[in-house]
Amino acid sequence: GLGDIFEAFFGGGAGARQPRSRVQPGNDALLRTTITLEEAFSGTKQDVTVDTAVLCEKCHGTGSQSESKPVTCGTCQGSGQIQETQQSFLGNVMTTRECPTCRGYGEVIQDPCPQCAGDGRVRATRDLTVNIPAGINSGMRIRMADQGEVGHGGGPAGDLYVEVQVEPHPVFVRENNDLHLRLNVPMYDAALGTELAVDNLAGGETIIEVPGGTQPGDTIHLPGEGMPRLRAEGAGDMIAHVQVAVPTALSNDERAALEDLRAGCPDDARV
């Protein structure tokens, strides 16, 4: 290319790159897992299986069957590059490319390990335990240091990131650290006031006080009864959205009682 042409004409060859190190750091790995809202509330531990490159146990990352040191590449004389002459519109020009024998390392392994073919690493599955903290939300990632891919030549491993997804819940809808729910309140209880129990995420019950005169669409806030704050003190709120349940079938006595109640209401209360 033009870069090679200018390099050849203007002395760029003197600044040619050094052969790359055979030992390279490994890449990070990503794993996705799913938990329930109850597990996100309390925190949990989850066993996962990961498939990554690990250190070759046969050669211990050297890539050599005898664990001998690599020797200087005879093709590029250890530079990791070879020069070639190519025809161009300017005539013959010298270009530089990666040595195909040593793949740019400047050295070769004379007796490659049969297990890893000289790479110093092999693919393997591993079982790990992930500690998932209370308060975690969908899309958040947990970093497990040095549990990712081992690098070429037995280089240091990258990190493993576990991305968490929280399943939808049949009762609660999460918004940040708040928990929303629909609370069905019988018409009589909405008028007179009552206490209702709902199952919470901790496995117990939360008592919700419904004041007399509660209207459809009203919200009742319970401070500190929501999701715990991730790695912090306190929790969000539980917010109950009231739906007043109007009976569809009435006994004669119930109908008579409601008619008496309606008859005693002032006119402005019926608007």
Give a label for each model feature:
Residues A53-C56, T62, P70-C73, T96-C99, ...:
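Residues immediately within or flanking Cys/His clusters that coordinate Zn2+
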Residues S66-P70, Q83-Q87, I109-P112, R123-D127:
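Short Cys/His-rich "knuckle" micro-motifs
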Residues C56-K58, F172-V173:
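Short aromatic-acidic-glycine turn motif
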Residues G1-Q24, E67-T72, C76-E98:
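Long amphipathic alpha-helical segments used for membrane anchoring, targeting, substrate engagement
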Residues F41-V48, E57-S64, Q83-L90, E98-G104:
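Short, intrinsically disordered, charge-biased short linear motifs at domain edges
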Residues R22-K45, E107-V271:
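Charged, often glycine-enriched C-terminal and inter-domain segments
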